[in-house]
Amino acid sequence: MIKMTGVQKFFDDFQALTDINLEVPAGQVVVVLGPSGSGKSTLCRTINRLETIEEGTIEIDGKLLPEEGKDLAKIRADVGMVFQSFNLFPHLTIKDNVTLGPMKVRKMKKSEANEVAMKLLERVGIANQAEKYPAQLSGGQQQRVAIARALAMNPKIMLFDEPTSALDPEMVNEVLDVMASLAKEGMTMVCVTHEMGFARRAADRVLFMSDGAIVEDSDPETFFTNPQTDRAKDFLGKILAH
């Protein structure tokens, strides 16, 4: 479903990604862990070309990701993304935030888009907030709207870039629960997160990044109980000590 081959990314002289080779089959849930500045978010953002790459290729569902144009827009429509910030339109109701993409990009009729939106808002547990505006919702609720909005496009892949890091601690679990239920339903997911419990519980596979490279790639049990590199051991020692 996702194939990255020899991907290199620079910000001026700084190499953010080094020779990334990664294949994610359909239905797999991949959690990307690593210290700050290790390239996790950059990796996630290159998958739908929010960040350009200097070398290498990226394929989504067998199609080469172009640099720009209509073909890129088509592929992007199949890749849902949820960010640290919710990026909801403040002047639109919750329901209208969710229906906008399907109507504009998928050319869905308003009645059908409304039906899809209400089903998804139900699924993420906030159908009763459909007519409210983003400012009237908590951070956790807004992030769940952002997930519903991404799902409304019926994506083949969902990317999550630290979706809980801007939330108050008591709101984190409500978002992780939605993500875990998506994982159980077989959605192909790449999640950048610091939530170790989620990684252990919901991931099929853990990637550990350091200095722009993937240095470990294993199942969660192996990674958390028997990490292979000193860098990963050090990282887990610091994180799990708290």
Curated annotation (Swiss-Prot):
EC number assigned by the record: 7.4.2.1
Enzyme class, UniProt record, top EC level: translocase
PROSITE patterns: ABC_TRANSPORTER_1, ABC_TRANSPORTER_2
UniProt: ATP binding residues: 34-41
Entry annotated with the keyword Methyltransferase: no
Main location: membrane
Ranges where the ABC transporter domain occurs: 2-236
Protein's cellular compartments: Cell membrane
Membrane disposition: Peripheral membrane protein
Catalyzed reactions per annotation: a polar amino acid(out) + ATP + H2O = a polar amino acid(in) + ADP + phosphate + H(+); L-glutamate(out) + ATP + H2O = L-glutamate(in) + ADP + phosphate + H(+)
Record field: transmembrane: none
Keywords, sorted A to Z: Amino-acid transport, ATP-binding, Cell membrane, Membrane, Nucleotide-binding, Translocase, Transport
Pfam families hit by this protein: ABC_tran (PF00005)
Gene Ontology molecular-function annotations: ABC-type amino acid transporter activity; ATP binding; ATP hydrolysis activity
GO cellular component, one term: plasma membrane
Subunit structure: The complex is composed of two ATP-binding proteins (GluA), two transmembrane proteins (GluC and GluD) and a solute-binding protein (GluB).
Function: Part of the ABC transporter complex GluABCD involved in glutamate uptake. Probably responsible for energy coupling to the transport system.
Family per record: Belongs to the ABC transporter superfamily.
PANTHER family: AMINO ACID IMPORT ATP-BINDING PROTEIN (PTHR43166), GLUTAMATE_ASPARTATE IMPORT ATP-BINDING PROTEIN GLTL (PTHR43166:SF9)
Protein name in UniProt: Glutamate transport ATP-binding protein GluA
Organism: Corynebacterium efficiens (strain DSM 44549 / YS-314 / AJ 12310 / JCM 11189 / NBRC 100395)
Gene: gluA
